[in-house]
Amino acid sequence: MLKKLSYILAAITLVCTMAFAAGCGSKNSDDKQAAPKASFRSIADIKQSGKLIIGVFSDKAPFGYIDKDGNYQGYDVYFAERLAKDLGVKAEYISLEPANRVEYAKTGKVDIVLANFTVTKERAEQVDFALPYMKVALGVVSPKKDNITSIDQLKDKLLIVAKGTTAETYFDKHHPEVKLLKFDQYTDCLLYTSPSPRD
């Protein structure tokens, strides 16, 4: 069961890295090792290459996942295909984890990120966001027999979250008393919650 919490997340958005050019790397000339320069492709570069490189999830249905035939599917992928079509190019996908979305966007490893990416102040200081294309709320999923209806019920329970998500940030900041078990991938979160004697 999905329980909406009072803390509603801003919006899942398209991260637009093509325009992101300032603030990457060290500006201090005394640094012995400067951060490598990020390489961002312009729309003209993308059109000339014939492909738009898009960071998506590969394990978070219905947003981004790989189907039984090995093809990327989901809402974010559908949106990516439309963007590529509008540019007259093919979509090329790079599988991301929640914790590496900012890195891939700000270093130019992908042209854009379409991976269920909520706008936060901290993220907006590092990457540029376009307008939202969906809204979500933070929630908790629990077995029917242990229906969670309030945060107080999470005391002495183990809450599973994906690293680099707003769920992780929210609980770390607002509810440090809740024990978190953090995984890199949503697949691992799901596997750990499969029927077992765990909470």
Predicted regions mapped to residue ranges:
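Bacterial N-terminal signal peptides that target proteins for export
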Residues: 1-9
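Flexible hinge/capping segments at coil-to-helix
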Residues: 142-159
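Bacterial N-terminal signal peptides
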Residues: 10-19
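Ligand-binding "clamshell"
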Residues: 121-132, 136, 176-177
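Bacterial lipoprotein signal-peptidase II cleavage site
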Residues: 21-33
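Extracytoplasmic small-molecule ligand-binding "clamshell" domains
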Residues: 35-116
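Conserved small/polar residues in nucleotide/adenosyl-binding loops
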Residues: 192-199
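Ligand-binding cleft/hinge of the Venus flytrap
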Residues: 66-68, 80-89, 167-185
